[in-house]
Amino acid sequence: MASRLLRGAGALAAQTLRARGPNGVAVVRSMASGGGVPTDEEQATGLEREVMMAARKGLDPYNILAPKAASGTKEDPNLVPSITNKRIVGCICEEDNSTVIWFWVHKGETQRCPSCGTHYKLVSHQLAH
């Protein structure tokens, strides 16, 4: 029984020594700054990391955020990004409306919603590659 305890204690001591660096200070084996739980930025990889880095710079390369609403007048229309020369748009018209009014917006002049008269304008958009 005693030999089993001594063997376990010796293995634990050897493991502790291996975890220390050459100067005797314990090596942190975590990617987190400060040895705690990693932050979202430290743990994110791939597309998630790319989106987080772009958001930090104030960019939205994959159109994840809601579009910025304008006043909807002819002078200040709602901008509709599109990679083609037309796009279908849905207008709710009123806050408590239960139906969506769908219509096509074509490149060029601003177009109005047939129901409420809100103006929309198609703008060219390039995909992020």
From Swiss-Prot:
UniProt key word Hydrolase: no
Residues that coordinate or bind Zn(2+): 91, 93, 113, 116
Subcellular location per the Swiss-Prot or TrEMBL entry: Mitochondrion inner membrane
Modified residues (N6-acetyllysine): 68, 86, 121
Example of a GO biological process term: mitochondrial electron transport, cytochrome c to oxygen
SUPFAM superfamilies: Rubredoxin-like (SSF57802)
InterPro entries listed in its UniProt record: Cyt_c_oxidase_su5b (IPR002124), Cyt_c_oxidase_su5b_sf (IPR036972)
GO CC terms, sorted: mitochondrial inner membrane; respiratory chain complex IV
UniProt keyword Mitochondrion, yes or no: yes
UniProt transit peptide range: 1-31
Pathways involved: Energy metabolism; oxidative phosphorylation
GO molecular function ontology, one term from the record: metal ion binding
Bilayer topology term: Peripheral membrane protein
Chief location of this protein within or outside the cell: mitochondrion
Domain of life of the organism encoding this protein: Eukaryota
Keyword terms: Acetylation, Membrane, Metal-binding, Mitochondrion, Mitochondrion inner membrane, Transit peptide, Zinc
Biological function: Component of the cytochrome c oxidase, the last enzyme in the mitochondrial electron transport chain which drives oxidative phosphorylation. The respiratory chain contains 3 multisubunit complexes succinate dehydrogenase (complex II, CII), ubiquinol-cytochrome c oxidoreductase (cytochrome b-c1 complex, complex III, CIII) and cytochrome c oxidase (complex IV, CIV), that cooperate to transfer electrons derived from NADH and succinate to molecular oxygen, creating an electrochemical gradient over the inner membrane that drives transmembrane transport and the ATP synthase.
Subunit structure comment from the entry: Component of the cytochrome c oxidase (complex IV, CIV), a multisubunit enzyme composed of 14 subunits. The complex is composed of a catalytic core of 3 subunits MT-CO1, MT-CO2 and MT-CO3, encoded in the mitochondrial DNA, and 11 supernumerary subunits COX4I, COX5A, COX5B, COX6A, COX6B, COX6C, COX7A, COX7B, COX7C, COX8 and NDUFA4, which are encoded in the nuclear genome.
Membership in a protein family: Belongs to the cytochrome c oxidase subunit 5B family.
PANTHER family reported for this sequence: CYTOCHROME C OXIDASE SUBUNIT 5B, MITOCHONDRIAL
Protein name stated in the entry: Cytochrome c oxidase subunit 5B, mitochondrial
Organism: Sus scrofa (Pig)
